[in-house]
Amino acid sequence: KRKTMQIKVKYFAMLREALDCDEETVTIPETVKTVGELKAWLTDKDDTHRAAFTSVKRIRAAVNGVMAQDAAALKDGDETAYFPPVTGG
């Protein structure tokens, strides 16, 4: 039974700029099982993450290069990406 999981998290656009970081590997507790739970956990990580995640109204996510909903399950070693919705013009 797992106690923690390692997830690589990539940030794009405004999130990357706000965090001054394009990727990090995080060790998450066993209570964090989905994309949405990871987003909430990252938001609570520290003041910088909270400011970055709350400044973007809707954050899209991908897991291992595939668009994912908040309910998508995570597994050890997954690569997630968070980014604002793409706007065209």
Where are these regions (language model features)?
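Ubiquitin-like/PB1-type beta-grasp interaction modules and other compact soluble beta-rich domains
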Residues: K1-G88
